[in-house]
Amino acid sequence: MAAEGEVIACHTVEDWTEKLKAANESKKLIVIDFTATWCPPCRFIAPVFADLAKKHLDVVFFKVDVDELNTVAEEFKVQAMPTFIFMKEGEIKETVVGAAKEEIIANLEKHKTVVAAA
């Protein structure tokens, strides 16, 4: 896996499968940015996403190019870019469509820590 504080870019389905499995086993929150090189909002949010990865070392950040890994995008039912999927231990917790910085940050904080039921 990439060093802490970095966004992990996967370029093959095999690489994606291997890295996602390792991330799921870590039990950390996973945030996946489904992006495209031709998408202006994707380019706008990319530095914000990279900055969040640097600030939240207890979260695993992935970047998936929908044109490179279209089967992965289809698996997650991505319809528009950017789409951010928040997952924990293989379960999708939240989906954010669009370059909505505040919504991404709010979901990051919401799902990062799970409070044990009393």
Swiss-Prot record:
Thiol-disulfide oxidoreductase that possesses disulfide reductase and insulin disulfide bonds reducing activities. Heat shock causes oligomerization and formation of high molecular weight (HMW) complexes with concomitant functional switching from a disulfide reductase to chaperone. Keywords: Acetylation, Chaperone, Cytoplasm, Disulfide bond, Electron transport, Redox-active center, Transport. The lineage of its organism: Eukaryota, Viridiplantae, Streptophyta, Embryophyta, Tracheophyta. Disulfide bonds join C39-C42. InterPro entries: Thioredoxin-like_sf, Thioredoxin_CS, Thioredoxin_domain, Thioredoxin_H-type-like. GO terms for biological process: defense response to fungus; heat acclimation; protein complex oligomerization; protein folding; response to heat; response to microbial phytotoxin. The keyword Membrane does not apply. Belongs to the thioredoxin family. Plant H-type subfamily. It comes from the Eukaryota. This is Thioredoxin H3. One of its GO terms (molecular function) is mRNA binding. Interacts with FBA5 and FBA8. Interacts with FBA6. Interacts with MDH1. One of its GO terms (cellular component) is plasma membrane. Disruption phenotype: High sensitivity to heat shock. The active site is at C39 (nucleophile), C42 (nucleophile). The modification N-acetylalanine is found at A2. It is found in: Cytoplasm. Residues 2-113 form the Thioredoxin domain. The gene is TRX3. The keyword Transport applies.
